[in-house]
């Protein structure tokens, strides 16, 4: 069923995001907050209206926050809440709103125990994070020391009508920000800034079909539902396309269900999951459900396939292990690939991919084994095997081995990502047939 939020009254408001950090503007750190927060807010029925990045400069932050409060009902800042000299957001906003900073003993205790649990000495300077603007709502940080803060700006002297607004300050590190948003900030927003009507959304995740083809196949079929209020969106990633169905109102669950049925009738084979599911989560989940195990043999992906699998909780029950065989010699020693096969066909070939998978299956005793061997570039390609060529192998107990050739003409990192996703999709389809 589509995700929903409570059907409670209240206007939809402008939301602005201010990311702070000189390192973001210098390009030393990738700013992922806008994409991630934008998606999370959209999935809950809210939409970012503006986003700006400012340096760790008090005047720049002040001007950005004041300008945003003059337009928006919710302003979110990220970063600048830590203990170092360039973490100035908390103090600057407290001064701007004439809110004195007050010590919060519960935060101080959390910071002290944070260091004690790690058996590390605590610098006294970190306790500055326990100073919060008077009247602020505190979001405890379970993954760090800087709490998130929410302040109601009422009256809002920066807005021409004095209309109240909320200001949310969130920590900068993604590993701290993301769980805080999911567990605390989004529930807070739903409570204090409710939507006019219940919002519903559903995302279908596909792999192995291009965005243009998906749109051409679906747009005409879904137009009658869109005319009745359904919002349809496509988001292309490397080798993948997300199809997002959303909207508000009592009729929307039925419209989304009808749209999903239409989409599945057209491209069900390519749909691997829904909403936030990843291909690795789907594959690991199915293996757990069937009680089967998996081994991998990697060359050009450098261990990324095993890395993605072991990122999934519960993978230890199904993952037998992985072998990283970059050189021909290691392919022979660890996987038993025949020297004659390598000499006749080359390392990037159907035959070697099959022997790698068969070797991984034999060594590990697993039920399934995946293999990848390819040319990531920028060098090493030939006319017959250009850079981007990759062979994927799959063998399973009781089944004939399978190998497929793919072509991913990207930079090395993107090549590796596309390759491991295709390998996992290869296994997913086999599991789907035998399940």
Where are these regions (language model features)?
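Short alpha-helical segments enriched in small residues
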Residues: 253-435
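Glycine-rich oxoanion-binding loops at beta->alpha junctions
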Residues: 38, 42-67, 103-144, 330-367
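Glycine-rich beta-strand-to-loop/alpha-helix junction loops that act as flexible
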Residues: 20-22, 77-85, 171-172, 248-249, ...
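Glycine-rich phosphate/diphosphate-binding loop of Rossmann-like nucleotide-binding domains
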Residues: 12-52, 56
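Accessory alpha-helical/coil subdomains and C-terminal extensions
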Residues: 155-239, 246-248, 255-256
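Proline/glycine-rich low-complexity loops and linkers
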Residues: 60-66, 70, 87-192
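Conserved hydrophobic helix-helix packing surfaces used for dimerization/oligomerization
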Residues: 15-17, 167, 294
């Amino acid at each position: 069923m589509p995700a929903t939020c409570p059907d409670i009254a209240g206007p939809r408001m402008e939301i602005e995001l201010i990311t702070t950090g000189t390192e973001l503007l210098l390009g030393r750190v990738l700013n992922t907050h806008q994409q991630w927060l934008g998606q999370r807010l959209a999935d809950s029925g809210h939409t970012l209206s503006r986003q700006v990045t400012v340096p760790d400069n008090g005047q720049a932050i002040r001007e950005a926050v004041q300008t945003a409060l003059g337009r928006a009902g919710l302003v979110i800042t990220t970063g600048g809440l830590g203990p170092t000299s360039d973490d100035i957001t908390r103090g600057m906003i407290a001064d701007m709103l004439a809110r004195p900073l007050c010590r919060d003993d519960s935060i101080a205790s959390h910071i002290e125990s944070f260091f004690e649990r790690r058996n590390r000495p605590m610098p006294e300077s970190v306790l500055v994070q326990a100073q919060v603007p008077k009247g602020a709502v505190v979001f405890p940080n379970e993954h760090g020391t800087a709490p998130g803060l929410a302040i109601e700006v009422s009256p809002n002297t920066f807005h021409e009508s004095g209309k109240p607004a909320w200001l949310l300050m969130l920590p900068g590190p993604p590993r701290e920000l993301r769980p805080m948003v999911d567990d605390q900030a989004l529930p807070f927003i739903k409570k204090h800034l409710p939507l006019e009507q219940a919002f519903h959304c559903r995302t279908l995740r596909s792999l192995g079909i291009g965005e243009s083809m998906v749109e051409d196949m679906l747009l005409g079929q879904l137009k009658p539902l869109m005319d009745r209020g359904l919002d349809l969106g496509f988001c292309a990633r490397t080798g993948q396309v997300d199809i997002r169905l959303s909207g508000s109102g009592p009729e929307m669950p039925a419209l989304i269900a009808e749209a999903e049925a239409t989409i599945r009738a057209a491209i069900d084979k390519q749909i691997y999951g829904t909403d936030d599911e990843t291909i690795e989560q789907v594959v690991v989940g199915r293996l757990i459900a069937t009680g089967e195990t998996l081994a991998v043999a990697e060359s050009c992906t450098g261990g990324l396939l095993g890395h993605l699998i072991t990122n999934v909780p519960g993978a230890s029950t199904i993952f037998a292990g992985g072998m990283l065989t970059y050189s021909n010699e290691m392919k022979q020693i660890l996987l038993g690939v025949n020297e004659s096969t390598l000499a006749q066909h080359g390392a990037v070939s159907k035959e070697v991919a099959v022997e790698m998978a068969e070797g991984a299956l034999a060594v590990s005793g697993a039920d399934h084994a995946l293999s990848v061997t390819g040319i990531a570039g920028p060098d090493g390609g030939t006319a017959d095997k250009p850079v981007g060529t990759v062979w994927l192998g799959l063998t399973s107990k009781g089944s004939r081995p399978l190998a497929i050739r793919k072509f991913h003409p990207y930079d090395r990192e993107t090549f590796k990502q596309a390759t491991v996703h295709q390998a996992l999709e290869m296994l997913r389809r086999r599991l789907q047939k035998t399940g």
